[in-house]
UniProtKB/Swiss-Prot annotation:
It comes from Olea europaea. GO terms for cellular component: cell cortex; cytoskeleton. Keywords: Actin-binding, Allergen, Cytoplasm, Cytoskeleton, Disulfide bond, Phosphoprotein. Occurs in many kinds of cells as a complex with monomeric actin in a 1:1 ratio. Belongs to the profilin family. This is Profilin-2. The lineage of its organism: Eukaryota, Viridiplantae, Streptophyta, Embryophyta, Tracheophyta. Binds to actin and affects the structure of the cytoskeleton. At high concentrations, profilin prevents the polymerization of actin, whereas it enhances it at low concentrations. Disulfide bonds join C13-C118. SUPFAM superfamilies: Profilin (actin-binding protein) (SSF55770).
Amino acid sequence: MSWQTYVDDHLMCDIEGHEGHRLTAAAIVGHDGSVWAQSATFPQFKPEEMNGIMTDFNEPGHLAPTGLHLGGTKYMVIQGEAGAVIRGKKGSGGITIKKTGQALVFGIYEEPVTPGQCNMVVEGLGDYLLEQGL
């Protein structure tokens, strides 16, 4: 299965039990910042933004004072799981990033999708990839 298939079929799909509700954007990005696959709507990000995200996974709390930036959008960092999940909020939407052994799984959402639904979709795929040794 291609990485694009994971994005299209497992991240940008209808949320279970909520037909028509789906993430706004999604991607799978290597730890080095290389894009493995992304939705057409995923923002163009700067290398320093990806570096900041990777630093926060290695040094939890790094992004808390400045916020998480992706594609020029600033998200307020909210509760996550140190070294495993970063969550951010901006207005009625937000972002979830799950770290696997080799990649970062990104999901960006806006209402009516809820933070919990985004977490479920992104972390579900991330956990699956971890189980596969990825």
